[in-house]
A protein has these predicted regions:
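Negatively charged, low-complexity tracts enriched in Asp/Glu with abundant Ser/Thr
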Residues: 1-55
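Mixed-charge, Lys/Arg-enriched low-complexity segments
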Residues: 63-151
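Acidic, aromatic-enriched beta-alpha/helix-loop junctions
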Residues: 38-82
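Short Lys/Arg-rich cationic patches that frequently serve as NLS/NoLS or arginine-rich RNA/DNA-binding motifs
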Residues: 1-2, 151, 159
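DE-rich, low-complexity intrinsically disordered acidic tracts
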Residues: 155-189
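Intrinsically disordered, low-complexity, compositionally biased regions/tails
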Residues: 13, 21-23, 73, 80, ...
């Protein structure tokens, strides 16, 4: 099976089932003891069958360690959305109060991308505006902010597919267990 690459440069990387054959979700995160200081969640979309090519069309991330990193606890959640024929957009997603347990936030990001895959594909293809994105599961009420930025494109990946049967696709529940173990909590917390 041809698949997009896992995020590079992270302590832990996983591929999570997306429920679609034309999409993959990948997750990368770092560990410092039982703390996760940075993570990346990507939604990959198959943009070409011949040659097979995957693009990362939606990106959610957190990095509290880098000077130019995005700290979701200070700046809020956002999604960078690639567009096929225009520059990428940065959409701020309102949330009420994010849990301090990063694993819960990462799982929330994977759920958000999985449940709203068609929205991200439609924005990528130009069939829908990025304005008024789906709400974050906690129902945050602040208005969404849409910022068109060209620098977002440089962080999104366009890659050829690759073969690696050793990289299994895990379920959302398996991801939850991995994240809980990384933070030294139980999956129910």
């Amino acid at each position: 099976m041809s698949i997009p690459s896992l995020p590079a440069g992270y302590d832990v990387t996983k591929r999570v089932g997306s429920g679609r054959s034309d999409c993959h979700i990948t997750v990368g995160f770092d560990r410092e003891g039982t703390h996760i200081p940075r993570f990346l969640v990507l939604l990959h979309y198959q943009v070409s069958a011949d040659p097979l090519q995957w693009d990362a069309i939606a990106r959610m991330d957190h990095n509290e360690t880098a000077a130019l990193g995005h700290d979701i606890y200070k700046e809020g959640l956002h999604v960078d959305i690639a567009r096929r024929y225009e520059s990428a957009v940065h959409v701020e997603i309102s949330d009420n109060l994010l849990p301090s347990i990063r694993g819960i936030v990462i799982r929330g990001c994977t759920d958000y991308l999985e449940k709203n895959t068609q929205y991200f594909i439609d924005v990528f293809e130009g069939d829908q505006s990025a304005a008024n994105p789906p709400k974050w599961p906690d129902g945050g009420e602040s208005p969404h902010t849409l910022i068109s930025t060209k620098h977002v494109n440089t962080g999104m990946s366009k890659e050829q597919s690759r073969e690696d049967p050793s990289e299994e696709v895990i379920s959302m529940d398996e991801l939850t267990e991995i994240l809980a173990e990384a933070e030294g909590v139980t999956p129910e917390e």
